[in-house]
Amino acid sequence: MKNRQNRQKKAQPLPVLFICISVLPAVILTLMFTIWPTVQALYLSFTNATSLGLNNKFVALDNYIYMFHDKSFIQALINTAKLMAVVPVITIFCSLVLAFVLNQCKLKEMVLYRTLFYFPNIVSLTVVGIIWSFVFHPNVGIVNKILGAVGLESLQRSWLGDSKTALWCIAFTLLWQAAGYYMVMHIAAMDGISPEIYESATLDGASAWRKLISIAMPLMKDIIGITFVLALSGTINLSFVLSQVMTGGGPNGASSVLLQYMYTQGFVNGNFGYAMAITVFTLAISVALSMLSRKLTDASEGGQ
């Protein structure tokens, strides 16, 4: 009996050792490709590092101070704020409408429609940007072709070359690309709403619009809050690719966004220190949104 107990005591450390060995590769990769680059970016943001990497000097907060005196950065920040104020709201609303229609209309082709609406999210964002660049092209683009066909030639323009419309073309492309993704999440939430609630509303004479506004949305407020924060974060990240592919930040910075301006400073102008300061600033915004998302998730779980 004593020998068996001694063997069990000796065997206890083995599972712990096995767990440590199993986790070690993930820890090493996280340190190499996440923690260390983040620390290095934070350090470089306090230096005047350039692409040559010579004579990097510690400049303290100079990059951050200059950031808010840089008109191009301010323009990129304002453009990003505009997208964050408009795109998530419209995207979530459109995805809710699509989800409600597909949830209520019991069609045989339901799977097909869900797939079609979700498909833009599967396509590479670079490909999406190229496709919509052709759609908005002033000469061969379908937008100007349609306007010409219906006699609205006065509205034809170079959509991506006009400072008044370039940013909103990117916003529309973001909406088209992301609506299907959030639609799937909202459909999953709507499937959890009892059909009896909708039936009672129908007997009371409620329209489909009233069911969406007064029944579905209040019951889904937690998941809507989460998807809204995800849409905010996605707008920051995805707008960079579309801005770079569709307009390159032009014309004259009219469609430049934070990450696109960071890319220009770091990889075009070679101002790595300043680019890293912009990166850290953008990262701080993303972390704040992630914390808000986690808070909403915890609140949702606590209410269930």
Q: Could you describe each region identified by the protein language model?
A:
Residues 1-13:
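Short, Lys/Arg-rich, polar N-terminal cytosolic tail immediately upstream
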Residues 11-304:
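A structural signal for multi-pass alpha-helical bundles of membrane permease subunits
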